[in-house]
């Protein structure tokens, strides 16, 4: 479909797998380390299958997104999966693999742009929206490692 986006992002984090898992599983922590992307997250207590959270986030482009996610899989310290709806609708999966230097992170993100403005502009601005995703993931790469290292202490 024209408004579908599929992203696969991978990188290595110099921090223990358990700490990286804890940071990614608990969306309430995202505004602490995934700045300036995540503005606010409201969640129902500790992360668990079936638990929901609401996110308010933005990229570099001048628009904000509001989503609700529900954890569908939680397999410590390897996998966090969630379904999402709102301005974006789809599924995200974090897969973590232990490496000699820390943790390999893979993020699979398959979403449809349901925000009317995004849906309308996707045929023209898809490259800009993909760039915006890459910018947001770069902020995750910058913030996740130091945050997970602090958790590990």
Q: Which residues are covered by each model-predicted region?
A:
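Alpha-helix N-cap/helix-start motif
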Residues: 23, 64, 117-118
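Short amphipathic alpha-helical segments
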Residues: 16-19, 132, 136
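Beta-strand/loop substructures that line and gate deep hydrophobic ligand-binding cavities in soluble
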Residues: 83-135
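Well-ordered beta-strand positions
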Residues: 12, 72-73, 95-97
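Hydrophobic ligand-binding cavity/cleft-lining segments
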Residues: 1-48, 153
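Glycine-rich portal/gate segments that line the openings of hydrophobic small-molecule binding cavities
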Residues: 32, 41-91, 101-104, 135, ...
